[in-house]
From Swiss-Prot:
Gene: aguA1
The name this protein goes by in its record: Putative agmatine deiminase 1
A GO molecular function held by the record: agmatine deiminase activity
Gene Ontology terms: biological process: putrescine biosynthetic process
Gene3D superfamilies noted in UniProt: L-arginine/glycine Amidinotransferase, Chain A (3.75.10.10)
Length: 363
């Protein structure tokens, strides 16, 4: 693996849409007892279910720490590759590389700096040095050269692209004090355009209500295909989420993408508010410097946090009446894909969902 002193734009590489073909998918095995309840055992079962669902559509690699390797290997099917890799937590969407491709089919990784969603300002845990090495290690495993941006903080869950020059993100996240306070909005745009080969960036204001990642876009918005997008929605005007989703809808409805297309926006209603129970709260170890999980806290639940695989869509189930409505809507949006629901409350309790725990490798 080479570290290349250049940029995607200079070298003719672009970030493809997630709906384009994949060579495979990465997942990190959860274990932090101060984030995942009951020693991460319930979460591990949910991660197995996600990995298994995706493995029916494309190759899956699960990376696990040395102390969890044997356990992960035992719990996962033989079709899933398990590799030992140090990590601080299980959010490979954010700590892993953002892959870019060229017209010849070559793939490279963009290795952003990772600081646990806000560093010493409002990061979620410390230290995060193992997570900051995950992208490089995955590039090594995949034998892909990389671009390394040691001075630019970004998480993969904070961006979505259409593969044709347009990126969508949120001001709440990318302009937050804990990311790149030394850079202006225009300077941040310049970096993204240079390393992902973009022509236009659409800025939403905020992400899902109470999203602890400072409003990652992948929990509120997704690209179905170029020009067609999905948005988390609620019809309950008394819910704080309504104002946020309405604001996003208004922005998207009045924007055009890099190709000059008006966006076709499809709403997918979120479940009813999901709160942490007393039992769930007590199952998480209390550690200074880590975000606590308190009884009654509202979780940032959204069906938009799904993963698009080769011929499949893997989406979260919450035990809510809207589960089936979300399935129907996703099947309409992806008529040529098999839509698979996976029970995801245990992942949600850790602070994210299916899209957050996955990272695709394009081909």
């Amino acid at each position: 693996m080479r570290t290349i002193d250049s940029s995607s734009k200079k070298d003719g590489f672009r970030m493809p849409g997630e709906f384009e073909k994949h060579a495979g998918c990465y997942i990190i095995w959860p274990e932090r007892p101060d984030n995942w309840r009951l020693g991460a055992k319930p979460a591990q079962k949910a991660f197995v279910d996600v990995a298994t669902a995706i493995s029916h559509f494309e190759p899956v690699t699960v990376v696990a720490s040395s102390s969890q390797y044997v356990n992960a290997r035992y719990m996962l099917s033989d079709e899933i590759r398990v590799v030992e890799m140090d990590n601080d937590d299980a959010w490979v969407r954010d700590s892993g590389p953002t892959f870019v491709v060229n017209d010849s089919g070559d793939v490279r990784g963009v290795d952003w700096s990772f600081n646990s969603w806000g560093g010493l300002v409002d990061g979620l845990y410390f230290p995060w040095d193992k997570d900051d090495q995950v992208a490089q290690k995955i590039c090594e495993l995949e034998r892909k050269d990389r671009y390394r941006l040691a001075d630019f903080v970004l998480e993969g869950g904070s961006i979505h692209v259409d593969g044709e020059g347009t990126l969508v993100t949120t001001e709440e996240c990318l302009l937050s004090e804990g990311r790149n306070p030394q850079l202006s909005k225009q300077q941040i745009e310049m970096v993204l355009k240079e390393y992902l080969n973009l022509e236009k960036i659409i800025w939403l204001k905020r992400g899902i209500y109470l999203d602890e990642t400072n409003g990652h876009v992948d929990n509120i918005f997704n690209y179905v295909r170029p020009g067609v997008v999905a948005l988390a929605w609620t019809d309950d005007e008394t819910d704080p989420q309504y104002e946020i989703s309405k604001e996003c809808f208004d922005i998207l409805s009045n924007e055009t993408d890099a190709k000059g297309r008006k966006l076709e926006v499809h709403k997918i209603n979120v479940p009813k508010p999901i709160l942490i129970t007393d039992e769930e709260s007590k199952g998480v170890d209390a550690v200074e410097g880590t975000l606590p999980r308190e009884e009654g806290d509202r979780l940032a639940a959204s069906y938009i946090n799904y993963y698009t695989a080769n011929g499949g869509v893997i989406f979260p189930l919450f035990g809510d009446p809207n589960d089936e409505l979300a399935r129907e809507k996703l099947q309409q949006l992806y008529p040529n894909c098999e839509v698979v629901g996976v029970k995801a409350r245990e992942i949600l309790l850790g602070g994210g969902n299916i899209h957050c725990i996955t990272q695709q490798v394009p081909r």
